[in-house]
């Protein structure tokens, strides 16, 4: 089971090959963490959101790796993997596109994280196209995320 924060996370997961039935959408990082505390053997993907308060659950996790803008933690007691996208999905996607030499503007998105964050929910089909374009380039960052969540 993959626990996610928001609709753009769901689009990303589905485009990377995670079945819809295997995704649980929660509305924010705190709710994802609460759900993790009640389950066993899940994977979660959340934004780091460094400027916001962090759920206490995150302090109980053990770091596994930190590469490609993804910090991976595990919860040994509950057998969870928590993938933290740094700093937020939007900035991570912009950096991933730049690394792959794909222009996010070609898909109607701004190169600025806050602007992309504001628009992303109204452009989910374009987000899917962007992710598919990144997959076609064999983006190392995106393929790393795919291995972690799929």
Which positions does each model-derived feature cover?
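Acidic, divalent-metal-binding catalytic cores of TOPRIM
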Residues: 1-150
């Amino acid at each position: 089971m993959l626990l996610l924060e928001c609709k753009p996370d769901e689009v990303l997961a589905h485009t990377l090959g995670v079945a819809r039935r295997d995704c649980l959408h929660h509305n924010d990082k705190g709710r994802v963490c609460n759900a993790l505390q009640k389950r066993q053997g899940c994977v979660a993907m959340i934004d780091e959101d460094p400027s916001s308060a962090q759920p206490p659950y995150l302090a109980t996790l053990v770091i596994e790796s930190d590469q490609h803008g993804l910090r991976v933690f595990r919860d040994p007691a509950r057998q969870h993997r928590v993938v933290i996208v740094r700093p937020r999905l939007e900035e991570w996607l912009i950096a991933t596109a730049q690394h792959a030499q794909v222009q996010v503007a070609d898909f109607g998105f701004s190169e600025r994280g806050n602007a992309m964050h504001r628009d992303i929910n109204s452009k989910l089909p374009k987000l899917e196209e962007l992710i598919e374009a990144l997959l076609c380039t064999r983006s190392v960052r995106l393929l790393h995320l795919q291995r972690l969540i799929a």
